[in-house]
């Protein structure tokens, strides 16, 4: 509207651009090329507006004009350094397009400090820590400061479970996973069952070492079934060799040789087609 008023040399442009600058930015994603002209006009008419360069940066980034996008976001951040999303965007751009890990982490941490209620930024900050190989125990300790945020996102719950498994806290991982109902999400295929099975296999190995063979059998048999709360079913051709191998070991310890051999034979069965 402001751009149209400017083109028509009509009154009221100042009021319209001032109002636009104060609008909530949620779900506002300019995506047409003509929006570039309108946003540039807004920046000229209201140089103190931090939202126009933010929107312009989003549009440029979508069109793969990464340097222009970052320049626009930097302008937005200078005008309003309390807007977390622009720092988040800059963090991702510096990491993915400039390979500047230190600056990316600095900006993402700043974004989260500005809004510690944003579960998405927490997830993205942890993923940055993961990419720069932050120790598992440090990441776990950081995440567990925000249990309410973790509970909002399946991927954060899964990351906590994964870190528990990676730090050897298999009982905690198992308990947390069994208490949560997951929903399918793109890119998450197979990740929840993998952690479900990992915790049980490691606990089964501990049970075997301690001579608790029946406990090990129960845990390993659970690996062969996908309960509903995992949010996905078993795929055809799922590799279960290790479960069968340890089941064979458990039955051997119980002097049930025939069953042990049967499970070991199942453990030798693999894909019938060659893989790359």
Regions found by a protein language model. Give the residues of each.
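Flexible helix-coil transition and linker loops at the boundaries of alpha-helical arrays
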Residues: 25-28, 40-45, 145-150, 183-193, ...
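Single-residue signature of alpha-solenoid repeat helices
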Residues: 13, 35, 69, 104, ...
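Conserved structural position within tetratricopeptide repeats
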Residues: 22, 43-44, 74-78, 110-113, ...
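Residue-level recognition of tetratricopeptide repeat
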Residues: 3, 58, 92-93, 127, ...
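Position-specific recognition of the canonical hydrophobic site in helix A of tetratricopeptide repeat
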Residues: 6, 61, 95-96, 130, ...
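Helix-start (N-cap) detector for alpha-helical repeat units in TPR-like alpha-solenoids
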Residues: 28, 50-51, 84-85, 119-120, ...
């Amino acid at each position: 509207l402001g751009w149209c008023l400017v083109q028509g040399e009509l009154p009221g442009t100042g009021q319209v651009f001032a109002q636009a600058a104060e609008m909530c930015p949620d779900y506002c994603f300019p995506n047409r090329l003509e929006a570039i002209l309108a946003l540039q006009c807004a920046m000229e008419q209201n140089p103190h507006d931090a939202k126009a360069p933010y929107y312009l940066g989003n549009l440029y980034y979508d069109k793969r004009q990464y340097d222009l996008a970052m320049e626009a976001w930097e302008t937005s951040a200078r005008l309003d350094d309390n807007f977390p999303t622009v720092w988040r965007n800059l963090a991702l751009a510096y990491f993915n397009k400039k390979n500047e890990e230190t600056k990316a982490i600095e900006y993402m941490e700043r974004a989260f400090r500005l809004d510690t209620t944003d579960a998405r930024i927490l997830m993205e900050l942890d993923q940055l820590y993961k990419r720069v190989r932050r120790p598992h125990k440090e990441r776990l300790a950081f995440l567990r400061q925000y249990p309410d945020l973790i509970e909002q996102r399946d991927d954060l719950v899964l990351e906590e479970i994964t870190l528990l498994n990676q730090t050897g806290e298999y009982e905690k991982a198992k308990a947390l996973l069994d208490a949560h109902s997951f929903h399918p999400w793109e890119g998450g295929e197979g990740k929840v069952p993998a952690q479900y099975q990992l915790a049980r296999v490691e606990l089964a190995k501990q049970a075997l070492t301690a001579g608790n063979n029946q406990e090990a059998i129960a845990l390993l048999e659970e690996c062969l079934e996908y309960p509903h709360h995992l949010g996905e079913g078993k795929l055809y051709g799922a590799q279960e060799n290790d479960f069968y191998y340890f089941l064979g070991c458990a039955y051997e310890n119980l002097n049930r040789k025939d069953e042990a051999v049967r499970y070991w034979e199942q453990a030798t069965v693999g894909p019938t087609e060659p893989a790359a």
